[in-house]
Amino acid sequence: TTNDFASTLELPKSIAKSSDIAVNGVPFKCDIGKFNSTTFNYVAAFGAFTDVPYDTPQETKNILGHTAYVLEGMKRLSSLPSYHVKIKYDNGEFEGDIFLCMILNATSVAGLHKTKQLKNVDLNDGLFEMLVFKRPTNLIEFQNILINLMRGENSGDEYLFAKSSYFEFECYENIKWTLDGEYGGNPKHTVINVVPSAMTFIIDKTHNMLKE
């Protein structure tokens, strides 16, 4: 209903226009992620709101589309979870209490595509982007997270942004992950690796990824 990956590949909603790209487009190799023993296309995430895509009733999603996710997410703002995690990634480590983590290879997630971090994503650079949101203690800190994210700040007191080909997560409790919007299991220990140029898609000749 939000078609994040189609948005990243700039595939039009029009069947006729998409058919034209399928016939006249060009091949583009895209990285994918390996999550322990399985794989995912563009996002692996856990924490607040990440179970909304598979917990929201399908009938509601069919009727309301992206709005269904927004409404379901709003109901949960007052009860943000907290996870104490250890994270290792290329050239860095992090340990602390967080409420949301996303490993991404997309310019659009949950229908959102206005942050500078996502705007500059390269789908076949061998790297995924990581956004880790530290748990706010009050409403002002939560507002600062949103403000700095929209400004494109890479890191700060509220969240961490990093690019890496490898991520390792350790938590004292089982974590419910979502992979591409579907339930991905609840391991305490997770290793994510980027698999370079693993899938080929047909995209429009004018896609900005082809200009780099």
Predicted regions and their residues:
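Short Pro/Gly-enriched beta-strand edge/turn motifs at strand-loop
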Residues: 13-16, 66-71, 148-150, 173-174
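Short solvent-exposed loop/turn micro-motifs enriched in small/polar/acidic residues
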Residues: 25-27, 78-80, 94, 114, ...
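Small-residue-rich beta-alpha loop regions that form the catalytic core of phosphotransfer
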Residues: 1-67
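ATP/nucleoside-binding phosphotransfer catalytic cores, i.e., glycine-rich phosphate-binding loops
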Residues: 89-90, 95, 120-125, 132-212
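Histidine-centered catalytic micro-motifs used for acid/base chemistry in nuclease
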Residues: 63-84
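Short hydrophobic-aromatic micro-motifs
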Residues: 38-45, 50-51, 94-105, 109-111, ...
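Oxyanion-binding "anion nests"
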Residues: 78-127
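Gly/Ser/Thr-rich active-site loops/lids in small-molecule metabolic enzymes
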Residues: 60-67, 108-109, 119-137
